[in-house]
Amino acid sequence: RNGEVTRLIKRCNDFGAGGVSVAIGELADGLMIDLDKVPKKYDGLDGTELAISESQERMAVVLAPEDVDAFLAAANRENLEATVVAEVTAEPRLRMTWKGVTIVDLSREFLNSNGAEKHTTASVPDDDVKPYEFAGDTVTEKLADMLGNLNICSKQGLSERFDSTIGAATVLMPFGGKYQLTPNQTMVAKLPVLHGTTDTVSGMAYGMHPEILSQSPYEGSYLAVIESVTKLVCAGFDYKQAYLTFQEYFERMGTDPTRWGKPFAALLGALDAQLDLNIAAIGGKDSMSGTFEKMDVPPTLCSFAIAPGKASEVISPEFKEAGHAIRLVSCDPHDTAALTANYDAVLSAIRAGKVVSAWALGLGGVAEGLFKMGIGNQIGTRIDDDYDGNLFAQQIGAMLLECTEDIDLGVKVGDTVPEWVLEYEGERIDLTAMQEIYEGKLDKVFSYRGHTGETTEKFSYSAETYPVPA
């Protein structure tokens, strides 16, 4: 945060896998690296180990020669170890010396070629995605089955094992409403500033549906991107300012064309979504060795969408008040023109104050959205008699809106009511029992609720007896 120091840095790179050879080797076309000057935790490492050993918590920076002393002095004031280990050279070659001997001498042209070409065969099946069906003959039975699904039930006990308040910049806490039970779909925090205040925030949301990815890696990856972006829009962010990053896991490839076909299809689906939305992925993390003996991970691509915004324009997903209209805005997620038009319309309504909460639909469809939006403030829903949509249909890219006025956007689903109930087709469902299913599914694994009658075991670190040798 010292501007005088940061302006000295021409280029920098973080250390990680590959160590010196990657972190420093990527900084310039021509480099002379003295491995004897590289700080090490212990002696005995040879030149190869010094060059390629993974190292963390280190950074390589490029400085002008006349700025080196000033930078070293600044590092010393912060109790940081800084060492000159390399020089940028005019000749485009990567050279490394160890004990006075040049042990690496490679042309940059060769390094940039990524070595010899590699070819493989990928077989991509024409997969059909079957819609997920929740068990039950009645709305009550389907709602109970849906809320007990591991991909839908409460993860609050797990979430609360992590501190969401570090830096005191959190805008949206993980769970909203006066009961703090509505899960926020977007992580929003102010950017850190040393002086004054700021309204600028960053928003991040994820998208992933394993039940779709297992059937069709292409469709699952495409919809992962759509879902992550839709969540940002529902929090008040402009999708046109978003960027993406992906996390991927796949089984070990080997030489099996069908195994190669899974990441091929997944990345193709994610690429098509980027091209359709005109949003780029600027980074990612992948693992192509998700196999242990005969066990394979399912094909997995998780999309994270990140965008800048203003705290004053951010909304949270919990229902705010009874008597508000609930509207559903949806379309085919592959109809890019309709989808982006929906994004723009919803964002405009949010910024105009006409939409006070919004939810990006997922596996549980409208029913999941109504329940999770309502649980934070225990505000229920009365569904209109003329609403004929499927409450439990998965609709990626669709948005459920709480409106302060009955705006002309999408279709009207119903209205919020002060009782914690769901009224649908003459049936009045008490959601308190459903809440127990939702919260109790993982309570034994990730407990976060106090239970009546429990006693806390007393722990003492004062020894009353001391063991002695026999």
What are these language model-derived features?
Residues 1-470:
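Glycine/proline-enriched, intrinsically flexible loops and inter-domain linkers
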